[in-house]
């Protein structure tokens, strides 16, 4: 098995939002993008606070990826659901094969009308990158930008290329090597 590891150079690059930053105090950013979320092919949320706030709008994400933490502190979001729930290991600063597989499988189920929630043991901070790669065009991926707002990524061919380039800049670590 293997995983992708964040490099110091890429960490700096990822400080910039991958999509459009919608600023404001909760719930303002979510109310501003509500119609866009309702029109999206799939809504993907990355993070506990983002998932919780999208659910409060009455929108159930096709795919939700969360780790029961916010700003490195334990957090118990109000995310009770009838979704298919998968649990994966994903250490901080990495994208594991298990996370990639869960996201890919999640979209397969979402395309058949199921809601899928991926509970990450570790950290889900980088999950937006593979979520964009596996999401069908016309989907929207949301993640939080702490103390600033929420980032909305419209999944397009250009956006997929950008995320593919980001993945290619990560260090590939073979587990057990």
UniProtKB/Swiss-Prot annotation:
Pfam families: DUF359 (PF04019). Disulfide bonds: none annotated. Keywords: Coenzyme A biosynthesis, GTP-binding, Kinase, Nucleotide-binding, Transferase. The keyword Ribonucleoprotein does not apply. It catalyses: 3'-dephospho-CoA + GTP = GDP + CoA + H(+). One of its GO terms (biological process) is coenzyme A biosynthetic process. Pathway: Cofactor biosynthesis; coenzyme A biosynthesis. GO terms for molecular function: GTP binding; kinase activity. InterPro entries: deph_CoA_kin_Thcocales, GTP-dep_dephospho-CoA_kin. Its EC number is 2.7.1.237. Belongs to the GTP-dependent DPCK family. This is GTP-dependent dephospho-CoA kinase. It comes from Thermococcus onnurineus (strain NA1).
